[in-house]
């Protein structure tokens, strides 16, 4: 289980970030992207949080909100979370669903992502790219 890197083995990889609007983030990632909620907590030393993952993956996203904490700064427009979606029909369906929920397509900072991809901002302004590609394997 886990991923073997050249100098260590990691059991899991978590990408964590703060938000000031946890309920909207949950709506976007759970209802909009249909990511599976794999964990959550509340009032843990003043923090509430939720974790989302892809089925059978050793990595997940965590979003936290601190009681009385400051709003996280808006990220650079080239700070991206990319989902490689090889099926064009599925890509159209997910982006259509998000647009119906009120999340509109935005122009990519890097024109590479506009060639076969759709970029949509989450409630905090972080950009999600749905790229019509099989991705890269690194093998």
Curated annotation (Swiss-Prot):
Residues 9-133 form the VOC domain. Gene3D superfamilies: 2,3-Dihydroxybiphenyl 1,2-Dioxygenase, domain 1. InterPro entries: Glyas_Bleomycin-R_OHBP_Dase, VOC. Pfam families: YycE-like_C, YycE-like_N. Signal peptide: none annotated. This is Uncharacterized protein YycE.
